Curated annotation (Swiss-Prot):
InterPro entries with a match to the protein in the record: Dxylulose-5-P_synthase, THDP-binding, Transketo_C/PFOR_II, Transketolase-like_Pyr-bd, Transketolase_BS, Transketolase_C, Transketolase_CS
Coiled coil stretches, renumbered: none
Gene: dxs
Family: Belongs to the transketolase family. DXPS subfamily.
Name of the protein this chain belongs to: 1-deoxy-D-xylulose-5-phosphate synthase
Substrates-to-products reaction catalysed: D-glyceraldehyde 3-phosphate + pyruvate + H(+) = 1-deoxy-D-xylulose 5-phosphate + CO2
SMART domains: Transket_pyr
Keywords: Isoprene biosynthesis, Magnesium, Metal-binding, Thiamine biosynthesis, Thiamine pyrophosphate, Transferase
Pathway in which this enzyme or protein is active: Metabolic intermediate biosynthesis; 1-deoxy-D-xylulose 5-phosphate biosynthesis; 1-deoxy-D-xylulose 5-phosphate from D-glyceraldehyde 3-phosphate and pyruvate: step 1/1
């Protein structure tokens, strides 16, 4: 638990208590809450900049609205630490993102105040609209609020929801948390006044009455519209959101409770869809995070008095870094290469690429569907697109992957980071399904590198193909096998035998382990005790059919191993291939179970799934009890 004293915050166990506080006390509470968030995250790691930026907004929302009766729907959800603290989870913040602890995102099973589970972006308006209309159908009177960031607002899904919500007859409030701009002091007071004015009942009624009165007089009506637009234009950009049917209010200072609370109070009395634009600053109140919000977006544990400190020892190369180096090297070799990311420059390892090749770098925003089809369009004109995307986010562009890329057999490379389990971010970010959902697509190739060296080589192999290929690799570092300097690839669709069975005279079942990806190394460790053959398959599609037949015919049983969903995964591909060839062998499929695996230490989570060396040995011994397991 944080060691600093937070006397007022320690009296708040639910928002009903917060609603009893006077405005001056709320300001004290916000200051303590910000300090608590900083101290907590410094001890556990987690998302920091975004949470420091939403403290006052969170306090104001819970103060004005009768949560949990009124629904707050957070977009993405990594900015909800203050929300969690104020809704009864303060004493559990020391378990944040740890196995058995509270999630770093909203989860319906964790609290009644978490009205909608989330971690991917741009879902809040759709969910909130559904809740608002469902409440109306039941005759329930409640307010529904979607809180969405400016980055998430760039996604098509958000605009689809706005388009629907603008014509829906319900009381929905969309709060745009804009943390990519600032309010200058001279404008702030006027903003506050106009926001309260525009959110007032008199303004809304007068605006609607004026439209009714002036409708028979088009010239006067047009003049009135232009005057209103010019008046708003003093403090806001041209408001697209009113074209969707929303009453636009703001922008207002998202760190000023004297602006937020009366404005939200006024909005509660309005009918129909409302849109409140608040401006916040990432890292607010912690100078180091304010100066570098990207570095403090998701830090590991650190000392708040010192800030982030680079390790004195050189860390092992990560798969993300391997990709970033390969991308720059291949771009220098082939000017056709273009790099595309849906707002994941840092996470996907594209910072150096952007710096060295700015005219070939495309950040399309949080828009995975667009990213995939954008790449397809570039490929049509002779470019060689490489789409750097997390495995879990490619799910959002699946139709485009099939219809726009694979159906037209376009040479697009998908670099799938965070394949498999991801640790602290939990089930929402796990890349558990890519093998299953990619291998069923015609024309698609899928590579599974075992280590850093193979990652670079298989990226080159994928790039050399004239059809779409994905290369999946896990978060963090691998076995420590240094990549080779060149750009040579490995044979497409071909694996290798990494360990041959040694005891040929044994009567025990002859076992072969077929490893896909980085689990090759625990497979090799397990094989020493089992005297099993180990095959590094490298490709989930196409499978190395010739090698598979050779291994199957020389062994009594096969074990497939993958850090992905068992159902429909690489193991399924093996059994399908053997069945089609008429080769009858028992196949033990090891991988991720048919459950959503929550947050925790990655190594411990893999062990719980039986995907470490000990678990592999135990599973094989249990399935094939006649085998001689060396101890």
């Amino acid at each position: 638990m944080p060691s600093t004293s937070f006397p007022l915050l320690e009296t708040i166990d639910d928002p009903a208590q917060l609603r009893q506080l006077a405005r001056a006390q709320l300001k004290v509470l916000a200051a303590e809450l910000r300090g608590f968030v900083l101290e907590s995250v410094s001890r556990t790691g987690g998302h920091l900049s975004s949470n420091l930026g939403t403290v006052e907004l969170t306090v104001a929302l819970h103060h004005v609205f009768q949560t949990p009766h009124d629904r707050l729907v957070w977009d993405v959800g990594h900015q909800t630490y203050a929300h969690k603290i104020l809704t009864g989870r303060r004493e559990r913040m020391h378990t944040l993102r740890q196995q058995g602890g509270i999630s770093g995102f909203p989860q319906r099973g964790e609290s009644v105040y978490d009205t909608f589970g989330t971690a991917h972006s741009s879902t809040s308006i759709s969910a909130a609209l559904g809740m608002a209309l469902a409440a109306k159908r039941k005759g329930e009177s409640r307010h529904t609020v979607a809180i969405i960031g400016d980055g998430a607002m760039s996604a098509g899904m958000a605009f689809e929801a706005l388009n629907n919500a603008g014509v829906a007859d319900c009381n929905l409030l969309v709060v745009l948390n804009d943390n990519d701009m600032s309010i200058s002091p001279p404008v702030g007071a006027l903003n506050r006044y106009l926001a309260q004015l525009m959110s007032g009942r008199f303004y809304a009624a007068a605006k609607n009455m004026g439209k009714t009165v002036l409708r028979p007089m088009p010239p006067l009506l047009e003049f009135a519209k232009r005057f209103e637009q010019q008046a708003k234009g003093l403090v806001v950009p041209a408001t697209l959101f009113e074209k969707f049917g929303f009453n636009y209010i703001g922008p207002i200072d998202g760190h000023d409770l004297d602006s937020l609370i009366p404005t939200l109070d006024n909005i509660k009395g309005l009918q129909g869809p409302q849109f409140l634009h608040v401006v916040t600053k990432k890292g607010q109140g912690y100078k180091l995070a304010e100066a570098d919000p990207v570095a403090y977006h998701g830090p590991a544990r650190f000392d708040p008095a010192v800030g982030l400190v680079k390790s004195s020892t050189a860390p092992r190369l990560t798969f993300t870094q391997v990709f970033g180096q390969w991308l720059c090297d291949m771009a220098a070799h082939d000017e056709r290469l273009v790099g595309i990311t849906p707002a994941m420059r840092e996470g996907s390892g594209m910072v150096e690429f952007e710096q060295r090749f700015p005219d070939r770098y495309y950040d399309v925003g949080i828009a995975e569907q667009h990213a995939v089809t954008f790449a397809a369009g570039m490929a049509c004109e002779g470019a060689k697109p490489v789409v750097a995307i997390y495995s879990t986010f490619l799910q959002r562009g699946y139709d485009q992957l099939i219809h726009d890329v694979a159906l037209q057999n376009l040479p697009v490379v998908f670099a799938l980071d965070r394949a498999g389990l991801v640790g602290a971010d939990g089930a929402t970010h796990a890349g558990a399904y890519d093998i299953a959902f990619l291998r069923c697509i015609p024309n698609m190739g899928l590579a599974c590198p075992a280590d850093e060296r193979e990652c670079r080589q298989l990226l080159s192999s994928a790039y050399a193909q004239n059809h779409p290929v994905a290369v999946r690799y896990p978060r963090g570092s691998g076995a420590g096998v240094a990549p080779l300097a060149g750009l040579d690839g490995l044979p497409f669709g071909k694996g290798e035998i990494r360990r041959e069975r040694q005891r040929q005279d044994s009567n025990a079942p002859r076992i072969a382990i077929l490893a896909f990806g980085s689990l090759l190394y625990p497979a090799l460790e397990a094989a020493d005790a089992l005297d099993a053959t180990v095959v590094n398959m490298r490709w989930a599609k196409p499978l190395d059919d010739a090698l598979l037949r050779q291994v199957a015919e020389g062994h009594d049983a096969l074990v497939t191993l993958e850090e992905g969903a068992i159902m429909g995964g690489a193991g399924s591909a093996v059994t399908e291939t053997l069945n089609a060839a008429g080769i009858l062998r028992p196949v033990l499929q090891l991988g991720l179970a048919d459950i959503f695996i929550e947050h925790g230490d990655p190594a411990k989570l893999l062990a719980m799934q039986g995907l470490n060396a000990a678990g592999i040995r135990a599973a094989i011994a249990a399935r094939f009890p006649a085998i001689d397991v060396a101890r």
